[in-house]
């Protein structure tokens, strides 16, 4: 009888222990669930407003070279001006030679012989081996420590995928994806050998949040996001930092927005935020080798990702409605313009 009592005693003690463990587990889970959004909020605010980014010089000293694609206008031009001000020589690549010459002349007049510039007119949509061979000749022997993958193309107006012109689809993929791959692959061996370097690739909310009526563009930018996260892990052991830079709307020719606001910075404001937050995630929390550095874009991405989910049906539906409206207005404008002619 005593042995049975002892046995039952052990069982009762064991049961009590299991109950206590379960209670503690539920309590800890509750505390974690309550604390997680608070911690996440603190993290995003610190990253966007308080903590500084890494210094550019940690990726390559002044006097080394920065290569910028899509350099003649908008964001690319502002990157060129900002990097020249910080003492970096420039390789400017874009489609129109006259615009490149004008930018190079502006930089030369401001900084004189302290900053060297090289230019190459190149239509990335053509994907010509001869163009990439010319680019390779241009950079051979140069210490290129910074690469800004900025060249990009979107649809002329929002358009259903079934109606997207074949040439437009091809150009978007060639410019956004293939050009970025080929230029990066051309420069990474040198960065690896020098054990330092910075690769910034301009992405878009259109790739982070699925965007109906911009399906090809959205897919191309989603590709850049996945590729950057994978490439960043590959190059990190070699001292090369990769950062996919996410953004919402900016006052550029691509967005067709002219007036800046709190939600829509101009290129200069966006570039300043990007270079001041190198290595910081901003609103792109828990996304490897990715940053959303501009404050309003960062808060927007963080909120949507945390509380709705970047690929949730609600977000996709909102995106579709917004771009259907943009398409209707664009078509009406085209009709009015046609009647005036």
Swiss-Prot record:
The active site is at residues 217, 221. CDD domains: 17beta-HSD1_like_SDR_c (cd05356). It is a single-pass membrane protein. NADP(+) binds at residues 67, 123, 131, 150, 217, 221, 250, 252. GO terms for molecular function: ketoreductase activity; very-long-chain 3-oxoacyl-CoA reductase activity. It is an enzyme of class 1 (oxidoreductase). The chain crosses the membrane at residues 22-42. Its EC number is 1.1.1.330. One of its GO terms (biological process) is very long-chain fatty acid biosynthetic process. It is found in: Endoplasmic reticulum membrane. It catalyses: a very-long-chain (3R)-3-hydroxyacyl-CoA + NADP(+) = a very-long-chain 3-oxoacyl-CoA + NADPH + H(+). Keywords: Endoplasmic reticulum, Fatty acid biosynthesis, Fatty acid metabolism, Lipid biosynthesis, Lipid metabolism, Membrane, NADP, Oxidoreductase, Transmembrane, Transmembrane helix. SUPFAM superfamilies: NAD(P)-binding Rossmann-fold domains. Gene3D superfamilies: NAD(P)-binding Rossmann-like Domain (3.40.50.720). GO terms for cellular component: endoplasmic reticulum; endoplasmic reticulum membrane. Pathway: Lipid metabolism; fatty acid biosynthesis. Belongs to the short-chain dehydrogenases/reductases (SDR) family. PANTHER family: HYDROXYSTEROID DEHYDROGENASE-LIKE PROTEIN 1 (PTHR43086:SF2), VERY-LONG-CHAIN 3-OXOOACYL-COA REDUCTASE (PTHR43086). Component of the microsomal membrane bound fatty acid elongation system, which produces the 26-carbon very long-chain fatty acids (VLCFA) from palmitate. Catalyzes the reduction of the 3-ketoacyl-CoA intermediate that is formed in each cycle of fatty acid elongation. VLCFAs serve as precursors for ceramide and sphingolipids. This is Very-long-chain 3-oxoacyl-CoA reductase.
């Amino acid at each position: 009888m005593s042995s049975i009592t002892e046995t039952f005693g052990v069982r009762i003690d064991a049961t009590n222990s299991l109950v206590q463990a379960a209670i503690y587990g539920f309590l800890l889970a509750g505390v974690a669930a309550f604390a997680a959004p608070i911690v996440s909020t603190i993290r995003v605010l610190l990253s966007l407003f308080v903590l500084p980014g890494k210094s550019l010089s940690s990726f390559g000293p002044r006097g080394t070279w920065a290569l910028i694609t899509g350099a003649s206008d908008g964001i690319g031009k502002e990157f060129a001006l900002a990097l020249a001000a910080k003492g970096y020589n420039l390789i400017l690549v874009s489609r129109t030679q006259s615009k490149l010459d004008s930018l190079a002349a502006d930089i030369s007049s401001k900084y004189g012989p302290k900053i060297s510039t090289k230019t190459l007119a190149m239509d990335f949509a053509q994907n010509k081996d001869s163009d990439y061979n010319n680019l390779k000749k241009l950079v051979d022997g140069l210490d290129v420590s910074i690469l800004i993958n900025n060249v990009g193309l979107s649809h002329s107006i929002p358009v259903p995928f079934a109606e997207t012109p074949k040439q437009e689809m091809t150009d978007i993929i060639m410019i956004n994806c293939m050009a970025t791959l080929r230029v990066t692959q051309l420069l990474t061996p040198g960065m690896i050998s020098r054990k330092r370097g910075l690769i910034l690739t301009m992405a878009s909310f259109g790739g982070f949040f699925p965007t109906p009526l911009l399906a090809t563009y959205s897919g191309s930018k989603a590709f850049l996001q996945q590729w950057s996260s994978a490439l960043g892990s590959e190059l990190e052991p070699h001292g090369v930092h990769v950062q996919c830079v996410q953004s919402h709307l900016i006052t550029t020719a691509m967005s067709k927005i002219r007036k800046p606001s709190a939600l829509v910075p101009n290129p200069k404001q966006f570039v300043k935020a990007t270079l001041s937050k190198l290595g910081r995630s901003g609103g792109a929390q828990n996304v490897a080798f990715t940053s959303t550095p501009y404050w309003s874009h960062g808060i927007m991405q963080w909120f949507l990702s945390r509380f709705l989910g970047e690929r949730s049906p609600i977000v996709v539906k909102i995106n579709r409605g917004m771009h259907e409206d943009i398409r209707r207005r664009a078509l009406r404008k085209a009709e009015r313009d046609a009647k005036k002619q």
